[in-house]
Design a protein with these regions (language model features):
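Short, well-ordered alpha-helical segments in soluble proteins
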Residues: 98-104, 123, 165
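Histidine/acidic-residue-rich catalytic or RNA/ligand-binding cores of hydrolases
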Residues: 12-17, 79-90, 108-113, 136-151, ...
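Active-site regions of enzymes building and remodeling cell-envelope glycoconjugates
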Residues: 2, 17-18, 95, 144-145, ...
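Glycine/proline-rich, flexible active-site/cofactor-binding loop segments
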Residues: 64-102
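Short, hydrophobic/aliphatic alpha-helical segments
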Residues: 111-125
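A metal-dependent hydrolase metal-coordination microenvironment
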Residues: 1-68, 72, 99-115, 131, ...
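Extracellular/periplasmic catalytic domains that process cell-envelope and extracellular macromolecules
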Residues: 10-13, 62-63, 88-92, 121-123
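C-terminal functional module detector
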Residues: 65, 122-127, 132-252
Length: 252
């Protein structure tokens, strides 16, 4: 289950969230009034304070230790970094942000990597989501996440999402991470096809791009505070596919 929640009564900013795992449908989204729902008493938007609405979403989660809230299209909504940090600090069940939202491409605001890195540079954990948003027929829609659950059940998938056991992909053409492992000192990864690996931290790209199917990086303990976080990407060709691993936070 999932639903989009928006138009909170106390939000002076264009806040949209999704809530994977929540069973509550808080409002309708008849944006173009195609279904005349407002005429039948269905409000457009939540019309509740966001904290109250978020608590209703938490209370409705399919499993209490899985799923949560994702902040939608932050670049399209022009969210200030301070506002995003405030939301993330309010509850650990706010999982992260949409780093890629294909529907926002029409406004040239589909990618939010800079916002993601800015949040991670503060030492906050923030998972990255890659989504289609509103698909239409006969379009090459992009954006998806690959969950790594322990079991093929909805509850296990939601727990994997809560724990960051997933990675992002743009086109979904079969490229995948075979493994990603970080023990605090060594980061290793592998893909099923040759790619360009790129490691990113607070200071930007670390070292040169690595070409091939395997990646390794030995992390100096003295550099922990300088980097704050590590996240790995794997790119196949030009505009063919790109994978995004979830970040490792290096600070307490």
């Amino acid at each position: 289950p999932n639903a989009e929640h928006h138009y909170f009564s106390d939000a002076s900013i264009y806040l949209h969230v999704t809530a994977p795992g929540a069973t509550l449908s808080s409002s309708m989204f008849d944006l173009k009034k195609e279904f005349a729902l407002a005429e039948h008493g269905y409000d457009f938007g939540v019309r509740l304070p966001w904290r109250e609405s978020f608590q209703k979403l938490y209370d409705s989660l399919l499993t209490p230790d899985g799923g949560g809230i994702v902040i939608a299209h932050p670049s399209w909504s022009h969210h200030p970094i301070s506002y995003l940090e405030m939301l993330l600090d309010s509850d650990p069940r706010i999982l992260g942000i949409e780093v890629f939202n294909n529907c926002s491409r029409i406004d040239y605001s589909d990618v939010s990597e800079d916002l993601w890195d800015a949040i991670l540079s503060s030492g906050r954990q923030c998972f990255g989501f890659f989504v289609v948003d509103h698909p239409r027929p006969n379009r090459n829609w992009l954006g998806r996440i690959v969950l790594l659950p322990e079991e093929r059940t909805a509850e296990s998938c939601l727990r994997a999402m809560r724990r960051g056991r997933f990675y992002g992909a743009i086109s979904g053409n079969g490229l995948r991470f075979e493994y990603i492992h970080f023990d605090g000192h060594m980061l290793t990864a592998a893909c099923n096809r040759p790619v360009e690996f790129q490691l990113i931290s607070k200071i930007g790209v670390i070292n040169d791009i690595t070409f091939g199917t395997k990646f390794h990086f030995e992390f100096p303990e003295a550099d922990r505070e300088k980097h704050t976080f590590l996240r790995l990407t794997a790119k196949e060709g030009n505009e063919i596919e790109k994978l995004y691993a979830q970040p490792f936070i290096l600070t307490d």
